[in-house]
Amino acid sequence: MNPRYRFILRFYSSKKPTFHNTAPSKTNVNVPRANKSQSKGKHKGKLLVLVGTLALVTSVISVNYQKNEPVEFLE
């Protein structure tokens, strides 16, 4: 095994896992938290629309530029 990878394995194996109690004391642990997953879905949808719009605008600008000033390739 490469010494570099041995160091990485040793580094990660030396860390001890830490468990944090994030639930309040009088909460049922088996009930899923729906509000966090919904907010992530909303942000993901907005980000997807933003990236799609940006890609479309960039493509239109590129096509228009190629029509007006075509690039001459060197041979």
Curated annotation (Swiss-Prot):
Major place of residence: membrane
Cellular component terms per the entry's GO annotation: membrane
Subcellular location, record wording: Membrane
Keyword hit for Transmembrane helix: yes
Keyword Transmembrane helix attributed: yes
Region (Disordered): 19-42
Biased composition (Polar residues): 19-38
Membrane topology per record: Single-pass membrane protein
Range of residues in the leader sequence: none
UniProt keywords, alphabetically: Membrane, Transmembrane, Transmembrane helix
Transmembrane intervals: 47-66
Protein name: Uncharacterized protein YKL023C-A
